[in-house]
């Protein structure tokens, strides 16, 4: 009986360790930027202070989509670097070309922090955004290009 109890405690410890390691692997501590598509010509680039228009799909690390401008067919517009969006966006969209698509993996400290944004975004959540820059100041993509929901 004592041997079984030790075995059971050891098994529970191993499973708990694996779960903690799996969560840690999904979380990031620094902003990660992946370029998914970049136009051959980059004549218009996003800089701090520019008014940008961005299509996006936001997901948690488990794949749960919490928001998407693609489904609404309504990109968000804001001043880049002006603190109107989460810090991960202000940093991750800098230098993006008009028509470029990026995947941003944003740690909680550059997202919604430890408080999250209940009920859809839990505290401490790493966020994943598929983004497409569809407008910079007075320049924009044609409607045909900006309505694609596949990144």
Swiss-Prot record:
Tissues expressed in: Ubiquitously expressed.
Any idea which GO molecular function terms this record carries?
A: peptidyl-prolyl cis-trans isomerase activity
Concerning Pfam families, the annotation shows: FKBP_C
Control of this protein's activity:
Inhibited by both FK506 and rapamycin.
Functional note: PPIases accelerate the folding of proteins. It catalyzes the cis-trans isomerization of proline imidic peptide bonds in oligopeptides.
- Residue positions of motif Prevents secretion from ER: 148-151
Q: Which residues form the PPIase FKBP-type domain?
A: 49-137
Record's subcellular location? Endoplasmic reticulum lumen
Q: Which GO terms describe its biological process?
A: chaperone-mediated protein folding
Induction note? By heat shock.
Q: Where is the signal peptide?
A: 1-22
Source species, please? Answer: Vicia faba
GO CC terms:
endoplasmic reticulum lumen
Q: Which family does it belong to?
A: Belongs to the FKBP-type PPIase family. FKBP2 subfamily.
User: Which reaction does this chain catalyze?
Assistant: [protein]-peptidylproline (omega=180) = [protein]-peptidylproline (omega=0)
Write down what this protein is called: FK506-binding protein 2
- Main site of residence? endoplasmic reticulum
Record EC number: 5.2.1.8
Keywords assigned by UniProt?
Endoplasmic reticulum, Isomerase, Rotamase, Signal, Stress response
């Amino acid at each position: 009986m004592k041997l079984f109890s030790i075995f059971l405690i050891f098994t529970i410890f191993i499973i708990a360790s694996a779960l903690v390691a799996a969560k840690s692997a999904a979380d990031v501590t620094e902003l990660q930027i992946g370029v998914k598509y970049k136009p051959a010509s980059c004549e218009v680039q996003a800089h701090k202070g520019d008014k940008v228009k961005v299509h996006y799909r936001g997901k948690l690390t488990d794949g749960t989509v919490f928001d998407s401008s693609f489904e609404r067919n309504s990109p968000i517009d804001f001043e880049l670097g002006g603190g109107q969006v989460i810090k991960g966006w202000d940093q991750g969209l800098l230098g993006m070309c008009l028509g470029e698509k990026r995947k941003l993996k944003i740690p909680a400290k550059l997202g919604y922090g430890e408080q999250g944004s209940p009920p859809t975004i839990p505290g401490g959540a790493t966020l994943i955004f598929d983004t497409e820059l569809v407008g910079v100041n007075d320049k924009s993509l044609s409607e045909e290009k900006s309505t694609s929901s596949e990144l």
